[in-house]
Amino acid sequence: LEEPPARVLILLICHQPARLLPTIRSRCRVLRCQPLSDEDLGRALGAAGVEAGDDLPALAALCEGSAGEAARLMASGGVPLYRSIMSILSGAPGLDRAAASQLANACTGAANADTYDNVIRLILLAITRLARAGAGAALNVVNVAEGETLARLSPNPTTARGWADLAQMLDARLAHGRAVNLDPSQLILDTFLHIDAEARRRAG
């Protein structure tokens, strides 16, 4: 970047420009790219041999136009899994512990390692979407039920701040739990209980 050869164009792709060093940003011109539309995302997935079908709008909402992330979610059953997580969160405060336990138990054992990874990632995504919704971000929702849950649990910037703080705390807690090999089912259930406690606290 400091001394590129003549007539050379370097494209630096970054999803979080604010995290780049100032010395890098000062040498770059910004070209902001919008997320792919649903139609373009569908075409990109089709070109990669992935058929999204009826899940395309939900994929677009969760992946914000990223074809690679959409393909990964399709391959891992991420859309129905996210719907299951949001169905549990829709009961907060006072969420269905039996449903939370059932999902947590599905994460145990070496054969379910991928499910464990996906559940963690999608729970954190759900909390992040709660924070963004309360902060006023214009989110495309997975379905009507998700939109209602986001609006009820995170109606304003104050609740958004609480969810953002919780997301940061749970991200660190989950990373530590995995590092020390805690029981997956207990770790996931504990995560749901923290979410329920935050919802109860915000409900006053």
Regions found by a protein language model. Give the residues of each.
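Charged, glycine-rich active-site and insertion segments that engage polyanionic ligands
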Residues: 6-9, 15-122, 127-129, 133-204
